[in-house]
Amino acid sequence: MTRPQPSGRPKTELPGRGLASVSQAGAYLVSQISNLDRVVALRYAISFGNQMDVTVSDYLAYLEGDPGTRVFAVYLEGFQRGDGERFLEAVRRIAGSGRPVLFYKAGRTREGSAAAASHTASAVGDYEVCE
């Protein structure tokens, strides 16, 4: 099976399948999609912004029920109040099912924390908590 490229040239079947990319920043997600489309076939690409209605944990809880999702990639600037524990529980369940969760936490430096606060109003908290 091949996928057409914008140039019209067919692309061979991609080896990686079943990736769910869940990102708090839309620009990060678009960059990821642009770079990964040569390597993996995304199953889901979700940008959730400031998490006013639906949190990162809600998305992971939903996606963990999809057996076609085999790898989870999460970019997070900060948790909503009380959501960190729910996130950890979801990650543990997913990892316990044999599926990896790749986690990139923004805000490791003072400058990164300031950028996250101005972008999605996230209080990034201590980076060490997420390690």
Give residue spans per PLM region.
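Catalytic-core regions of core metabolic enzymes
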Residues: 1-131
